Amino acid sequence: MNNKKQQNIQSEKTLTEIFKYNAGGEASEYHIIIHSTKPEDTYEEQLNAVLNTYDYLLTQELKGAVAILKRYFLSDAANQADTLLALTTEGSDCALSIVEQPPLDGTKIALWVYLLTDVQTQVLHNGLFEVKHSAYRHFWGGSAFNRAANSEYQTRLLLNDYVMQLMEQGCKLADNCIRTWFFVQNVDVNYAGVVKARNEVFVTQNLTEKTHYISSTGIDGRHADPKVLVQMDTYAVAGLQPEQIHFLYAPTHLNPTYEYGVSFERGTYVDYGDRRQVFISGTASICLLYTSPSPRD
């Protein structure tokens, strides 16, 4: 049975890529990416085209699905985020992530949405977005930030706050968090602070080289407020058994990340009764064990 489907939908001003996983009678998953195809249009025109396309798809190809995570990629967050938020406030009943990462096609906005069918959702009082299905509770967080003095302090506060959010739901960072995304302003300057804070917080949460880490992205990305040096998206699951979670190791080709001073897994997969979800870290892969066969390579 081929339960995976991919299709592209072209409209006058947008191109949508749709990836669907159909599990029969269980929850179906969608990843969609909506691109503007008119780089010459104003930001407002591109934004409206993307939003109109999304609204249309909800009545057609995505009928019955609910948004779990939306991530908007902007070319100039400082001048664009307020307009986006003003237009999407009523429809923001999911984890919302907004980051300045200009689309490579020269447009001003792109939208990635993760959707599910046959789930119950709610926004928790602590800001996490809860998704219930079967025996599992999934917690998504988008664009968490603060304005502490530097990237180290901001990251430490983000992670400590997240630990408390999880504790309120009977969860632990080490046992339940599956994936994090860190978007770092001027990453070449500020990433060292992120690494230091993450390493130090992880030790307090039993996340060490002897146990395991969390698959993650650490990449350049800006918030609309220049004082925000780090913003964080998160995903955790309650109800998993330890044997359902596995980590990607390839010792003949990739050394452990702690050997070069950072604390993340290169990949994680989670087994459910009807599917396997795979989370690959979105970061540079460094291998200290590589030996070039030729000085020219």
Identify the meaning behind each predicted range.
Residues 290-297:
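Conserved small/polar residues in nucleotide/adenosyl-binding loops
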Residues 13-26:
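Extended repeat-based interaction scaffolds and adjacent low-complexity, acidic/S/T/P-biased segments
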Residues 116-121, 127-131, 233-274:
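Surface-exposed beta-loop interaction hotspot
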Residues 131-136, 156:
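Cyclic-dinucleotide signaling modules
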Residues 57-66, 166-176:
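Phosphate/pyrophosphate-binding loops at sites that engage ATP/ADP/AMP, CoA/4′-phosphopantetheine
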Residues 69-75, 179-186:
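Short glycine-rich or small-residue beta-strand-to-loop segments that form or flank ligand, phosphate
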